[in-house]
Amino acid sequence: MASLRKTHPLLKIVNDALIDLPAPANISVWWNFGSLLGLCLLTQILTGLFLAMHYTSDIATAFSSVAHICRDVNYGWLIRNFHANGASFFFICLYLHIGRGLYYGSYLYKETWNVGVVLFLLVMMTAFVGYVLPWGQMSFWGATVITNLLSAVPYVGDILVQWIWGGFSVDNATLTRFFAFHFLFPFIIAAMTILHFLFLHETGSNNPAGLNSDADKVSFHPYFSYKDLLGFVVMLLALSTLSLFSPNLLGDPDNFIPANPLVTPPHIKPEWYFLFAYAILRSIPNKLGGVLALLSSILILMLVPILHTSKQRGLTFRPLTQILFWVLVADVAILTWIGGMPVEHPFIIVGQVASVLYFALFLVIMPTTGWMENKALKWN
């Protein structure tokens, strides 16, 4: 008789996705980040739920409610540190996951990839509205600067900004709705993750060789379930270490000052994981142009499958494009650094060069190199 996990309508879905799933035998540690992102999402939802039990979304009490969580709630300080640093780990895993997809040509599963880009945008939106909630100086001014960008939209810009603010400035209505959005989005992300999963399981996983692996599959459990478990332990250990020993390392000291609309912080900047996009935004001396560049810096990922020119899938056997991939990684690192620097010489020009290179790599240099490699191999 077949076991219950293979016959029960609900358990059968779990079985086909996590137990008897045929997975390529040669997938490396770079394939761990999908499950790590799932763990991050679960951690964020759980810690966020406990924080929401004690938080008040009112400008008079928001800042002190966060202080109350850290001082008076049992292990509130730990929950808050896990939640704040969990966001950083979420983005670390996200960038590594996207980097893996770019390196090994996983983007050729177009539906999975595009749902992934939408997920990326949703996570960014969630992190942005979440950063506003403690109602510190950087929360307030970050919200003011970023929401103000919508005023660059022709004709309806100003109306749009006031509609999002719920008034004529970032105020109580803004904080309340941002809290509502921050609570809602993770559940939308969870639903989209299931969709991401669904599309992935239509095709099966890619692998480091970029070849069809139907002839060489192993079951997900126990092989990759234990491999993922090791990743969980490593990530939770790193997150715990950061949260317990240096919880404010990645935060901004200005956010320990309650929001004051009359005093602007000397340098308004977002959290580290948005700095590369912020640098691209700032490198264009035009409001609408900057906003379009900011959007394009993320949405360009959707063009990657269309711009794939090589006859090979991944970069495993393509040394020229490999170099360009690492140039892209270095370029994003430079943009991240520039995003945290003041707008002055030489940072302005470095940011502009790095921004041009970022788009050039995706749109021109990598597709051309892929085509050249085909020519060199006489695969035209």
Swiss-Prot record:
Q: What PROSITE patterns does the database record attribute to this sequence?
A: CYTB_CTER, CYTB_NTER
Binding, heme b b562: 83, 182
Q: Which residues bind heme b b566?
A: 97, 196
Example GO CC term: the record gives: mitochondrial inner membrane
Q: What is its main location?
A: mitochondrion
Q: How many cofactor units bind, and how?
A: Binds 2 heme b groups non-covalently.
Q: Which residues bind a ubiquinone per the record?
A: 201
This protein's cofactor list reads:
heme b
Membrane topology per the entry is: Multi-pass membrane protein
Q: Where are the transmembrane segments?
A: 33-53, 77-98, 113-133, 178-198, 226-246, 288-308, 320-340, 347-367
Q: Per UniProt, what is one Pfam family of this protein?
A: Cytochrom_B_C
Q: Which cysteines share a disulfide bond?
A: none
What the protein does? Component of the ubiquinol-cytochrome c reductase complex (complex III or cytochrome b-c1 complex) that is part of the mitochondrial respiratory chain. The b-c1 complex mediates electron transfer from ubiquinol to cytochrome c. Contributes to the generation of a proton gradient across the mitochondrial membrane that is then used for ATP synthesis.
Q: How does it associate, per the subunit comment?
A: The cytochrome bc1 complex contains 3 respiratory subunits (MT-CYB, CYC1 and UQCRFS1), 2 core proteins (UQCRC1 and UQCRC2) and probably 6 low-molecular weight proteins.
Q: What else is known?
A: Heme 1 (or BL or b562) is low-potential and absorbs at about 562 nm, and heme 2 (or BH or b566) is high-potential and absorbs at about 566 nm.
The protein in question is named: Cytochrome b
